[in-house]
Every structure is written in structure tokens, then in C-alpha cells.
């Protein structure tokens, strides 16, 4: 079994500290701690229930659901990916545009997941759809950047450098191959539809949010 963990972009230096990305990470951690304290009632109140969205109810959960997570590994993995790709996009777009872009991507991702199971009453949650939006923007803007990555195969661990286009491209292919699965608290599945929807939103709209000079081809 192989695991690949992106650690960050080594091809560029950001002009300023990624304050918004850090704020998003801190908010996710805070909300997760609230989940641990308040339990399942908190999750059901703020997570996306597809059947509710289908009937125009609890639309705020399209945002709040992106800050909920199903466990320690879920939130840890998401925050590592966000910190690997988020700072460069925040630096290129500017803080406010990046924040709006991230939140809108999360909403689009959740809507994609709802579209795949509109009658479900099982909570959908997680930041991965919004993070997929950031990754979509990254592959458009900085495809040649090298991503420092930790590769773990059985007992062998090493750090290597992988072109962003290859790393993100393979990741997206995996999402497409698994797009039939649904992420739920009960099943422990992965929201592949949300990933695909968020990623495509990032790819299509990245140019609209970012000055042309920020792109690196």
C-alpha cells in the first residue's frame, strides 16, 4: 500500500504569509473540536443533508458542512492538502478573493454531491471539495511547479519532488474512477462527486479570479 502526502510548493516564494489559509485551518480545527464535545447532534445540525437541500431547506449547511469532518484522519489529511496548495493560490489571488473562491468552491462541491444523491438523509461533510477547488486552480496556474511530497510504501519512506500537473492530474483521475461513491459519516466513504465538482469549478474559474501576471506556464 502506498501513501503520498504533499508537503508544499518548492518552486515559488509567496510574497506574504498565507493568513487566510491559516484562518481556514484554525476554523476547521475549532469546528472539529466542537464536534467532539457536542456529538452527533452538532453534525446533523450543520452538515449537508441532501434531501433538505433538494427541498430548499438549511441552505447555510452548504457552507457550514465544509468545516465539519468525520474523524482525526479526515481533518488531518484535508488540512495537509490545503496547506500544500492554498498559500500559492492565496498569494496569487489576494486574500479576500481567495477566501470567496474557496467558500464558493465548497458550495459548488456540496451541490455536486447533493446532485448525486438528492433524496439521501445521511450527512455529507468535509473540506475536501473546497480544497479540490484550490487544486483545480493550482493545476491551471502553476502546472510546472514542483510539489515536495512524502511517499510512504510499506516500511519505505522518502521525500521526493513531483510536478504539480502530474500529482494533481493523477489525483483527479482517481476521483473520476471512484465517482460513484458517496461520503457519509456512517459509511466512511469519500465524496468523489464533491471532489470532481469542486476541482472543475477551480479549473474553469481560476482565470476569472486571478490577474494574468500571476500565472506560471
Report residues per predicted region.
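A detector for small-residue-rich transmembrane helices and their helix-helix packing motifs
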Residues: 1-217
Amino acid at each position: 500500500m502506498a501513501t503520498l502526502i504533499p508537503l508544499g510548493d518548492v518552486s515559488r516564494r509567496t510574497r506574504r504569509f498565507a493568513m487566510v489559509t491559516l484562518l481556514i485551518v484554525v476554523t476547521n480545527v475549532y469546528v472539529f473540536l466542537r464536534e467532539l464535545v457536542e456529538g452527533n447532534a452538532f453534525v446533523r445540525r450543520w452538515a449537508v443533508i441532501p434531501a433538505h437541500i433538494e427541498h430548499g431547506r438549511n441552505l447555510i449547511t452548504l457552507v457550514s458542512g465544509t468545516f465539519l469532518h468525520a474523524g482525526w484522519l479526515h481533518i488531518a489529511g484535508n488540512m495537509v492538502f490545503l496547506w500544500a496548495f492554498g498559500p500559492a493560490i492565496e498569494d496569487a489571488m489576494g486574500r479576500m478573493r481567495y477566501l470567496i473562491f474557496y467558500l464558493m468552491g465548497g458550495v459548488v462541491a456540496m451541490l455536486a454531491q447533493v446532485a448525486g444523491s438528492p433524496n439521501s438523509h445521511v450527512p455529507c461533510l468535509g473540506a475536501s471539495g473546497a480544497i479540490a477547488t484550490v487544486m483545480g486552480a493550482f493545476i491551471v496556474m502553476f502546472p510546472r511547479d514542483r510539489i515536495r511530497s512524502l511517499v510512504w510504501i510499506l516500511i519505505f519512506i522518502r521525500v521526493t519532488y513531483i510536478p504539480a500537473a502530474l500529482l494533481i492530474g493523477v489525483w483527479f483521475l482517481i476521483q473520476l474512477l471512484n465517482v460513484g461513491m458517496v461520503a457519509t459519516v456512517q459509511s466512511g466513504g469519500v465524496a468523489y462527486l464533491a471532489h470532481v465538482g469542486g476541482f472543475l469549478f477551480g479549473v474553469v474559474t481560476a482565470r476569472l479570479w486571478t490577474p494574468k501576471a500571476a500565472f506560471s506556464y
